[in-house]
Amino acid sequence: MTEPTAKVCHYTDVPAATFGDDAPGVSIRWVIDETKDGAPTYALRVIEVAPGGHTPDHTHPFEHENFVIEGKGRVQIDGEWHDVGVGDVVFVPPSAQHTYVNAGDVPFKFLCGIPVSRLMP
C-alpha cells in the first residue's frame, strides 16, 4: 500500500474510466483510493450516469455510502425503487441487490464511498 499523503485537487483532475458494456453512459473517477493516495480505510469515487444511462443490477459483499451532487436518479435496492436528487444520501447495505438509473435530462452524479480492498469481506 502507498503511504498516506494529503491530497487536494478538483475531481476533474482525476481521469474518468468507463464501467463497461453492461453500464451504458456510466463513468467513474477514483478521486481518493488506497493505490494512489494510500487511503487506509475508505475510497471515494465520483460516479456520473449520462441521460439514459444506468449501472448493471448487481451485488457485492461491501456497502456503499452515496451523496447525490447533480441531477436526478432512481436507485433500486433489493427490489425497492427510490427517487433521489441533489442533497440526498443513500446507504446500500452489504450484499444488497442494487442499480442506479439516470431519471433526468442532465448527468446524474453522486459520490460513492466504499471500504478499501483490505477491509472488504
Tell me what each language-model feature is.
Residues 1-41, 121:
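A short, N-terminal "cap"/entry segment at the start of jelly-roll beta-barrel domains
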Residues 55-57, 75-76, 92, 98-104:
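Short beta-strand His + acidic residue motifs that chelate non-heme Fe in jelly-roll/DSBH
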Residues 27, 40-45, 64, 71, ...:
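A generic structural signal for short beta-strands and their flanking turns/coil linkers
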